[in-house]
Regions:
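Conserved beta-loop-beta element that borders a ligand/cofactor-binding pocket
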Residues: 203-234
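Helix N-cap at the beta1-alpha1 junction of Rossmann-like dinucleotide-binding domains, i.e.
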Residues: 87-92, 116
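Glycine/proline-rich active-site loop of Rossmann-fold NAD(P)-dependent oxidoreductases
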Residues: 190, 196, 229-237
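N-terminal Rossmann NAD(P)H-binding glycine-rich loop of SDR-like oxidoreductase domains
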Residues: 57-78
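Conserved Rossmann-fold cofactor-binding substructure of NAD(P)-dependent oxidoreductases
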Residues: 110-133
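Flexible, Lys/Arg-rich cytosolic regulatory linkers and terminal tails that connect or flank
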Residues: 2-57, 169
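Short beta-strand element of Class I
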Residues: 81-84
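Conserved Rossmann-fold NAD(P)-dependent oxidoreductase catalytic core, especially the SDR/UDP-sugar
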Residues: 8, 23, 130, 136, ...
Length: 239
């Protein structure tokens, strides 16, 4: 019901419990996403974002997922030279392709259906498109599923991340942003463990590059996401 209301552009208001009484029922307060966050709103330096993304070649893995698809929409607003979008799910990737053609026809976008675990395919993509920045959002994320399929969790999340990180250094990517999860904090399940291993690997690789042990200039950054609030095509991230 709430999704249907929001889809029609109807705004929802909610009073606090202290205000909700017979005398103050008309004193309503608008509810925003920020009201749900247990922290202060983060201020973003938009000039730096524009300078980073404008006219650059951006590779996004997991581009058809809940986080990856919203990254595609947000990054496309800043006029990158090209988006290289990778996902193994054919149907949602096709939806992303149609969305880009409709909403951002001026942006060159390559929608590629493949797995990040194919080293030869990933190397071909890096060699062909030479991305400036990589946003790595591809991962198996459902905890119960990964408990029952631990080998696939390690294969996709860990091995796939290693392939991408190594290729980023090899092909001169400026910055590699890995999307992780709050479940990597003192992990108690297979999925969380797999993402923590990924964090340790890219952190170690970043240190090795800085110290000259590994030749390259790539900077590695990890960001942890908590829950994702999804309202149809509108995703709001809870960091």
């Amino acid at each position: 019901f709430q999704d249907a209301i929001l889809a029609e552009g109807i705004r929802i208001y909610m009073p606090t419990t202290q205000e909700w009484n017979a005398e103050q029922q008309q004193q309503l307060k608008e509810v925003s996403i920020e009201d749900l966050l247990p922290r202060d709103e983060i201020s973003i330096d938009m000039e730096s974002v524009v300078a980073m993304l404008h006219g650059k070649r951006i590779l996004i893995t997991g581009s058809a997922g809940s986080i990856g698809s919203e990254m595609v929409r947000q990054i496309a607003k800043y006029c990158p030279a090209e988006l290289i979008l990778i996902d193994s799910a054919e149907t949602p990737q096709h939806d992303i392709r149609l969305m880009m053609a409709k909403q951002f026809p001026e942006i060159k976008a390559e929608t590629i259906v493949t797995t990040i675990c194919s080293k030869s395919r990933m190397e071909h993509i890096f060699k062909t498109y030479m991305p400036d920045y990589v946003f790595h959002a591809a991962a198996y994320k459902h905890v119960p599923m990964m408990e029952n399929n631990p080998c696939e969790s390690i294969q996709n999340n860990v091995y796939g991340t290693k392939i991408l990180a190594d290729l980023a250094v090899k092909y001169g990517v400026k910055k590699f942003v890995m999307i992780s999860t709050d479940k990597a904090v003192n992990p108690t399940n297979v999925m969380g463990c797999s993402k923590r291993i990924c964090e340790i690997y890219v952190q170690s690789l970043n240190k090795a590059v800085k110290e000259g042990i590994v030749k390259g200039e790539t900077q590695f950054v990890t960001t942890r996401f908590g829950n994702v609030l999804v309202k149809k095509s509108i995703d709001a991230f809870v960091l």
